[in-house]
C-alpha cells in the first residue's frame, strides 16, 4: 500500500526492439515508437528492462474463498491413505501486472490504460538509462484460482530385525489461473503444466517418496525419490531447447546415528546421480540461466548435522 516506488528490472522481451520487431509498426506506435525508430531500437543483451515498482494508496483489500475436504483411510493397522481436495479463489489480488504483458496489451489493443504505463526513452529504449520504463506498481488484479488434490500414503512393517517405513506425498495440480486484467477476460492464463515469464514452473504432478529402515537401536537409513513432471514452455521467444523441460528425478540418501540417547549424527547425499538443473533463457531464470528454488541447482551435494538433547 505505502511501499516506496523505485526503478527495478523485469525479465522478458521488448516486442518492438531489434532489427526485426515481432510486432508491426502500427502496434509499436501505440507503445511510443515513432516510425523513424522502428527496427532500430536495441534489444537488451541481458533480456532485462526497466520498470517502476512500488505501492499504491488506492488499493482495496483482497477477498478469499477457500474450500477443502478430505478422506483418511486406515486400510490396515500399518497402512494409511489420505486424499485432500482444495480450492482457493482470491478476488482483488494485490500484485502488479507483468510489465511485458502491459507492453503487449498496449501494442495490440491501444488501450490508454496500458499505453499510459509505457514510457520510452528518447531513443525508444526501455533499458538504456533510466528515462525509459514500464510503470508496474501494485494494483488490484482480477483474481487467482488455485485448485488441486493432495495424496498421501504410508506403510510400516517389521522385518530383518528392524522397522521398514515407506511413504509417498504428492500433489496433482488441477488449476492455477491468474486474471491479471479485470476488464479483459482473455488475459486469464492457466499455468498448470507450463513455464513462461508469467508462470513459475507448475508441473501437473509432483511427489516425494521415501523408504526408511530403522534398526530401532543406534542407526537408520533413508532413501528419497523426488519427481517433477515435465513442463512446456509457452511464450513468444525460444528460451528453452525443444520448448519443454522433461521429467526431472532426484534420488537422495541419508543415515542417522544415535549416541547415548542424547546425540544424533545425520549424514547424507542429495541428488546422488548429480542431475543438472534445466537451463533456461535469461528472461525465465531466477538466477543466471537456471530457476533457483525449484529444481536442484547445486547438483550433487553432501551434508551433515549433529543434534544434542538434554
Predicted regions and their residues:
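Gram-negative outer-membrane beta-barrel transporters
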Residues: 80, 84-235
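Generic long, charged, amphipathic alpha-helical segments
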Residues: 222-226, 230-254
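C-terminal beta-signal and adjacent terminal beta-strands/loops
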Residues: 80, 91, 174-176, 226-234, ...
Amino acid at each position: 500500500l505505502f511501499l516506496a516506488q523505485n526503478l527495478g528490472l523485469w525479465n522478458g522481451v521488448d516486442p518492438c526492439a531489434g532489427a526485426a520487431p515481432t510486432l508491426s509498426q502500427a502496434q509499436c506506435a501505440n507503445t511510443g515508437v515513432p516510425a523513424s525508430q522502428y527496427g532500430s531500437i536495441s534489444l537488451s543483451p541481458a533480456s532485462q528492462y526497466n520498470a517502476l515498482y512500488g505501492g499504491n494508496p488506492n488499493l482495496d483489500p483482497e477477498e478469499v474463498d477457500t474450500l477443502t475436504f478430505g478422506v483418511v483411510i486406515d486400510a490396515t493397522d500399518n497402512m494409511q491413505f489420505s486424499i485432500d481436495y482444495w480450492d482457493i479463489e482470491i478476488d482483488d489480488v494485490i500484485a502488479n501486472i507483468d510489465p511485458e504483458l502491459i507492453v503487449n496489451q498496449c501494442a495490440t489493443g491501444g488501450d490508454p490504460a496500458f499505453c499510459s504505463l509505457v514510457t520510452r526513452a528518447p531513443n525508444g529504449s526501455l533499458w538504456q538509462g533510466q528515462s525509459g520504463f514500464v510503470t508496474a506498481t501494485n494494483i488490484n488484479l482480477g483474481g487467482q484460482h488455485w485448485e488441486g488434490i493432495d495424496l498421501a500414503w504410508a506403510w510400516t512393517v517389521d522385518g530383518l530385525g528392524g522397522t521398514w517405513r515407506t511413504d509417498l506425498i504428492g500433489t496433482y495440480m488441477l488449476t492455477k489461473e491468474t486474471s491479471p486484467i479485470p476488464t479483459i477476460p482473455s488475459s486469464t492464463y492457466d499455468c498448470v503444466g507450463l513455464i513462461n515469464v508469467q508462470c513459475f514452473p507448475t508441473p501437473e504432478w509432483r511427489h516425494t517418496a521415501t523408504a526408511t529402515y530403522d534398526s530401532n537401536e543406534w542407526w537408520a537409513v533413508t532413501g528419497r525419490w523426488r519427481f517433477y513432471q515435465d513442463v512446456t514452455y509457452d511464450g513468444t521467444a525460444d528460451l528453452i531447447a525443444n520448448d519443454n523441460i522433461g521429467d526431472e528425478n532426484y534420488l537422495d540418501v541419508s543415515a542417522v546415528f544415535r549416541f547415548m540417547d542424547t546425540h544424533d549424527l545425520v549424514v547424507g547425499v542429495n541428488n546422488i546421480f548429480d542431475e543438472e538443473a534445466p537451463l533456461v533463457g535469461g528472461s525465465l531464470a531466477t538466477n543466471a540461466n537456471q530457476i533457483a528454488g525449484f529444481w536442484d541447482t547445486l547438483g550433487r551435494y553432501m551434508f551433515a548435522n549433529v543434534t544434542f538433547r538434554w
